[in-house]
Swiss-Prot record:
Name this polypeptide is given: Methylenetetrahydrofolate--tRNA-(uracil-5-)-methyltransferase TrmFO
Gene Ontology CC terms, in alphabetical order: cytosol
GO molecular function, one term: tRNA (uracil(54)-C5)-methyltransferase activity, 5,10-methylenetetrahydrofolate-dependent
Binding site for FAD: G20, G21, G22, L23, A24, G25
Gene Ontology BP terms: tRNA methylation; tRNA wobble uridine modification
Cofactor list: FAD
Top-level EC class: transferase
Signal peptide coordinates: none
Places the protein is found: Cytoplasm
Organism: Rhodopseudomonas palustris (strain HaA2)
Amino acid sequence: MIIAAPPPQPASNQPVHVIGGGLAGSEATWQLARAGVRVVLHEMRPHRSTEAHKTDGLAELVCSNSFRSDDAANNAVGLLHAEMRRLGSLVMRAADANQVPAGGALAVDRDGFSAAVTKALAEHPLIEIRREEIAGLPPEDWGNVIVATGPLTSAALAEAVRALTDESALAFFDAIAPIVHRDSIDMSIAWFQSRYDKAGPGGSGADYLNCPMNREQYDAFVDALIAGDKVDFKDWEKDTPYFDGCLPIEVMAERGRETLRHGPMKPVGLTNPHNPTVKAYAIVQLRQDNKLGTLFNMVGFQTKLNYAAQQRVFRTIPGLENAEFARLGGLHRNTFLNSPKLLDAGLRLRAAPRLRFAGQMTGCEGYVESAGIGLVAGLSAAADALGRSMTTPPPTTALGALLGHITGGHIETIDAGPRSFQPMNINFGLFPPLAQAPTHGPDGKKLRGPEKSVAKKQALSARALADLDAWIAASLKLPAAA
């Protein structure tokens, strides 16, 4: 079911202001205008550019030109594509119209894509585009505002948001550790236990997964970390210093062979129930990353190793030999909110509800994810402007699962360590489990191995699209196109 444009309605007298003409801001603007709401879109380029942007086009793709897999049945980002298409996404329309050959992926001509988005927004009668920088919090008389300024948010606006919230509200380095699917961890080697069996708020005393190493395994691991191929910083990232709490694990290893086992891999306060008489030389800990307990992050393992090196090196860890990664690690300059603390379910800032946030600044990672959250923010702001109520997308959908991660799906840290919320790509680990996972194929044969995993993903996708259609009919009340 593809959603047709809603019937024409009187435009709201008070426009909604959108700050930032990237993927999220452009999509939010489009959704507002489609609903009959006047929009003023503020984009600071070309008057003020960033280190990464090269043009003044809206929705410029500053890195890759890929929107990743377009397989809605078997891939979470492909499912997100499908959901956004059903909701009349401008970003997906422009991507489809400017597609370039890329196998099963959706890749685009970046200039054609940006030009298509810019043209659609510039020609819409309810959209005004102002080329100006908003160097602080928007004026009160603007009313409802969507802030979608992205990972390169200007310093003035970032400081204004920080002052309105608190000192820990913004991070300027993405400290991304790898995330592993729980069911791919070998529990004949790993075990659950918190250090010294400490039970923190909401914890049980067995909140971490532990993977032990002996001396030989540890030394080989350190050597592999140091020798692994690294990803270089982009030119515009090189002047941003490391924060002590965000050092890449390979940088810690380079500072001394014992650094890691006195840091994130320290073996103290833990006893291996599989081999209780043998003390591990070092221990890798994984911490639950989502409320569903389907994803675990590798504590302290933020890294600049390239993806191939990460998979090779991290699968040498006992218990992770067959690890499936929902996300690999990284460290790059970014600006994002501690969204579960600061935003409500409608993406409104709790300290100032007239302000909504959208896109990468909220803690989603990736082009499509940013545009998807912009879409939800635009729909929500349109409902407010038109005096309607709108529920959030169901958590069983890709949009709802991503929104759930941003506004409440993370786990607070158990100890006194740094907060656990970090940016995330869409993946099936964010979705609630199926009430009944498929066990047999269409031919009646019992599913095993990869076939079982494929059937599970397909069932999650089918459920998501059915639930999205029901939500559209009940919450948005928009007519469906034939």
